[in-house]
Amino acid sequence: MDFKYSDTVIHNGVVFYITDGGHRVYFLYGGCLLSVPRPHATAESGEIAKFGLTLRGLTHNDRVVANYVRSELNRTGRHESAPSSEEDVFVDRLEVLAQGAQAFGRDICGSFDLEVYDPYLAECMVSLKVTSGLIVSTGRDIPQDGMLHLYTVPTITNASSGFIYTPNIACFTLVQAYLTELPPELETLISGLFDRIPVARPPLRDESGGHSRTDIIVTSPRAVKTMAIGGTTRCSKRPLRKTVVSDFVQVRLIPKPCSIWDSASRVASGASLQSLQLLFKIADEIILIEEPWPGLDEHLNQARSTIVDAILAVYGNEGKLRFFGGKLTQQGVTTLQRFVLCQFILGKWNLINCYAALEQLAESYIGAVPEARDPLPDPHLVADAVNEIIRESGILGELCEIIVRYTQPTDPVNGSGSEVVELEARLLAEFAANATRVELGLSSYDEVRNMEARIASVLNKLYAKDGIGGAAQVACRILGSGLPVAIVLNVSSITAFDGLDLSRKGAYYLYYLLSERLKRGGVTVHVSRK
């Protein structure tokens, strides 16, 4: 859910986001977003609204987590902060628990991030025992777009290591609430705020008949749950048998585009190892099963067909086109699993990928076939598999750049004889030359052909299931140097989960070759701007 704003102002130490021509402000309160109108507003535009995630339970049918937070608030003496049994528990109560009895309204304002150090709550949220605490991020501010974005599922990271977990989606629900009044501490906080905010001058001819409505863009087709907090006549008369949205907003449902490709990481899990384990396990099922499973929407079903086209473009029929990760086939890793591993790497580095679509397919499939989730494959085996691919592409990048820098006019090296390898060697020579600012136009024809032949020899070894060791061995021979051995040692230390420069280089070389194969295979990669 996206909230547009035009400007910001700091008042009483809190950032307020101005919208609706100065008639309304947003501010962050414990990871939730409160929308407050200018005093003396009309009944239509004077609604106080609260948007945010609420706590639910371990499954969709229980309220274990919400009840636990209520009991902890009462146990620690925060009775006034404990919602009644009829009300949902917003995530802002987590911040009250974390800060203790001394927490005041201003202390809880200003951030989308919440700290959770209660071991039981942490385990409920990520289905793992966590001793170092969690950081729960409920949204983000995008200043360049003037937009506040609330997540439907939070991003959860380890407070100590920064490890990104897969959230238990049953634990959270996005809710809009109507407030009859603000708590006294927040009333004090905003006192005098609107005296500092000028009202935009209305046009001479106002055809709208009142205040302009504020756009809130709902980016998910699932409706936001609505609830009322308080017992005023106005709220009690509101027909809440169906989901409605505040009178002061205009809701625009933006359907998700059919394109599966994106240039940013938009997965709910943040591309964690846990999500990769699940996708690695069920990749073949979610793509190759012929009939759509119950609950699979049309967009995701179309995505399966697009993914099949992409896999055929990259690996060919029955995987006959060789590519990175060929060594993994000896361990029983399928073509689809290798494709998932590649998309994971591209997503990690915000290169064009379809990992989010794959994860949505997995979530939909598990919703229909829950027994397909367990047991997950060994995390070490999955990590080793994805690390093999990033290391192969990493050593390729390093060796290509050395070859274009230091190739001498010696006897030419025999090429591989493979049309695909020779074509990609020519592309890689140009790509590596651009990366190292080497002017191929200044080299002779024979020197350039020699570069391409040497790159083809390295590429052929990688594609022939010999891995980084085989690539280094042939590179030592054609370069007449032991430098590739040192490169192997460096490459062996990188992983698909780190942020090292060598890992970035591997991701970019992987992306370049994969995108060229998609292009040659007739797969259009259209990135939707969200």
Curated annotation (Swiss-Prot):
Alphabetized UniProt keyword annotations: Host cytoplasm, Host nucleus, Virion, Virion tegument
Top-level lineage group: Viruses
Name the major location. virion
> GO terms for CC?
host cell cytoplasm; host cell nucleus; viral tegument
Where does the record say this protein resides? Virion tegument; Host cytoplasm; Host nucleus
**Which Pfam families does this chain map to?**
Herpes_UL21 (PF03252)
Assembly and partners?
A: Interacts (via C-terminus) with UL16.
Q: What's the family?
A: Belongs to the alphaherpesvirinae UL21 protein family.
State what this protein does: May participate in DNA packaging/capsid maturation events. Promotes efficient incorporation of tegument proteins UL46, UL49, and US3 homologs into virions. May also play a role in capsid transport to the trans-Golgi network (TGN).
Could you tell me what this protein is called?
A: Tegument protein UL21 homolog
Q: Which organism is it from?
A: Equine herpesvirus 1 (strain Ab4p)
